[in-house]
């Protein structure tokens, strides 16, 4: 038996399980990790040892190990944490595992120590498992051991470091703002925190550091950033969580081009450190150009299927739905061409009406141009030969195409077809190569909230109107544009920002247009208005959704896959049981009782 040496009591490990290669053959190593798999081949026992960096195969041979090492190997079970000492040796071509970065070597183990035992895990700790997400979230501490999840957390850490360094190198100052602040609702509900010392009064967890970073600009910070935790009590979707992280940025004594150029430098630097090239200067697309062409204010421009305006073609149509829209001010007739979907069965096409309804449609008009040259459609009988000819030409119709229509108010029609465009791209498995970056700029300043019967801010109530539209705000608020810019990545809103109102009178006018009385405005935002009176400089900023960007960089389906401890779609933490009841004594401490 080869000579063994005691494990160095001053070092838990000398190498990680992901770094050993052929050039390390002959090296003595100490490794720690979890038993991933164990295989008993009679006289030899093989074990895959896993840590956060990877997996290394261990070999236990009674002729090359002390007696305890082989005995321990016989008893080891999955997820036991162990510590071993051994010598790196080559596996040989016949037994090389090309799926592992360490697949050319193994460690001939001469000493082993069990650091703890484990009960049987509820699922296999490996990638590609068929386990429900609820189970994974309930045992999140086990799910995080999987290589895929650990790689996601590593990428998140690396990207956060990269953007911090990019900002620091450009003289941005990292400043922390309070997590307990005043309730100033910004579109979603606040999470509120009762004060024990001041009964009946409440703090709120910030939906964003928006007002505080503006105050930092008034205070002279000039270039600020923060990796900020934000809280919003809203309905959840695949890309939403009640608490999320954004890289928050603000600058003063700047105009919109200054801010966007600085952001492009920072983002290109950070993405470049991750091996992702972001070309600069970024394309800039006007909001209405994005809506009219892609049906989305966050378009994925890696594929076509553009929205096409057919309003003029159907102005005199016998199909009343189209004719009415074509002759009504503010309404349109538009379509998209899903090439290849024209071969779908009628039943499959009919189901698309249900999809369209989720985007606000009352139905879906369509024409399927079959491969054999025939046409299948419930509406084509109403079209004249001239209308069909014009439609074919403008939509670039070929056999196998499926043309889908929307008719009605411009924005709603754009949104319906934009939703269908995205759905069809997924259904047809249209390839989207690489990453897609652009700015969408100049959003409307307001939209009409039908439920409240009032104007609402499109972004937030502190956004500066475009200079040319300031005069028209009171006469025609919906026609006013804003100094805004959204950073779009792969068809997702990855970040957003804008220039801020830095004049107290203009800010009060904006709040009044949004339905605030002077008293309410003073109650909620008096501290901001007061600060703006003390020579507030021109300012603008941005917030990058860290969770969402990491989701896109890892190719994950949900931001939950790039967060250590996310909530479910209902806002629950299945691991801890939060939210949970609190004791009567705790409620009494803050002068509350349950109704």
Predicted regions and their residues:
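Class II aminoacyl-tRNA synthetase catalytic cores and aaRS-like
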Residues: 1-595
């Amino acid at each position: 038996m080869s000579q063994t040496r005691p494990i160095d009591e001053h070092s838990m490990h000398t190498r990680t399980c992901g770094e050993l290669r052929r050039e390390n053959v002959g090296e003595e190593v100490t490794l720690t990790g979890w038993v991933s798999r164990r295989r008993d081949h009679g006289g030899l026992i093989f074990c895959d040892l896993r840590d956060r960096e990877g997996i290394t195969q261990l070999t236990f041979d009674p002729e090359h190990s002390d007696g305890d090492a082989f005995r321990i190997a016989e008893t080891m079970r999955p997820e036991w944490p162990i510590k071993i000492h051994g010598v790196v040796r080559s596996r040989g071509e016949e037994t090389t595992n090309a799926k592992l970065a360490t697949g050319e070597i193994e460690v001939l183990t001469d000493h082993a120590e069990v650091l703890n035992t484990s009960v049987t895990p509820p699922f296999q700790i490996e990638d590609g498992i068929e386990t429900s997400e609820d189970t994974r979230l309930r045992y999140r501490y086990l799910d995080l051991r999987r290589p895929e999840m650990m790689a996601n957390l590593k990428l998140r850490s690396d990207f956060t470091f990269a953007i911090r360094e990019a900002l620091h190198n450009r003289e941005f100052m990292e400043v922390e703002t309070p997590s307990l602040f005043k309730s100033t609702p910004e579109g979603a509900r606040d999470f509120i925190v009762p004060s024990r010392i001041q009964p009946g009064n409440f703090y709120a967890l910030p939906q964003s550091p928006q007002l505080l970073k503006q105050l930092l600009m008034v205070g002279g910070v000039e270039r600020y950033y923060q990796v900020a935790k934000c809280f919003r009590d809203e309905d959840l979707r695949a890309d939403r969580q009640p608490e999320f992280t954004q890289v928050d940025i603000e600058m003063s004594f700047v105009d919109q081009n200054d801010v966007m150029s600085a952001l492009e430098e920072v983002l290109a630097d950070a993405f470049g450190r991750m091996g992702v090239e972001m070309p600069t200067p970024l394309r800039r697309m006007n909001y209405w150009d994005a809506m009219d062409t892609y049906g989305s204010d966050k378009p994925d421009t890696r594929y076509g299927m553009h929205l096409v305006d057919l309003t003029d073609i159907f102005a005199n149509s016998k199909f009343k739905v189209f004719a009415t829209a074509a002759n009504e001010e503010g309404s349109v007739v538009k379509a998209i061409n899903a090439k290849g979907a024209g071969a779908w069965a009628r039943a499959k096409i009919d189901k698309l009406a249900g999809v369209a309804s989720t985007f606000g449609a009352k139905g879906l008009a369509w024409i399927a141009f079959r491969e054999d040259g025939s046409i299948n459609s419930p509406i084509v009988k109403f079209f004249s030969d001239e209308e069909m000819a014009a439609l074919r030409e403008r939509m670039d119709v070929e056999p196998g195409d499926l043309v889908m229509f929307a008719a009605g108010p411009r924005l709603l029609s754009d949104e319906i077809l934009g939703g269908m465009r995205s759905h069809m791209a997924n259904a047809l498995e249209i390839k989207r190569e690489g990453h897609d970056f652009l700015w969408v700029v100049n959003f409307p300043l307001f939209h009409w909230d039908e439920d409240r019967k009032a104007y609402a801010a499109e972004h937030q109530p502190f956004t500066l109107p475009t200079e040319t539209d300031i005069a028209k705000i009171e006469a025609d608020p919906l026609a006013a544009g804003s100094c805004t810019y959204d950073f779009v990545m792969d068809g997702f809103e990855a970040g957003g920002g804008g220039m801020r109102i830095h004049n107290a009178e203009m800010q009060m006018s904006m709040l009044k247009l949004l339905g605030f009385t002077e008293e309410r405005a003073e109650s909620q935002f008096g501290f901001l208005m007061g600060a703006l009176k003390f020579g507030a400089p021109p300012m603008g900023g941005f917030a990058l959704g860290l969770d969402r960007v990491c989701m896109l960089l890892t190719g994950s389906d949900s931001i939950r896959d790039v967060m250590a401890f996310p909530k479910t779609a209902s806002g629950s933490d299945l691991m801890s049981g939060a939210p949970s009841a609190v004791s009567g004594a705790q409620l009494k401490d803050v002068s509350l009782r349950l109704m």
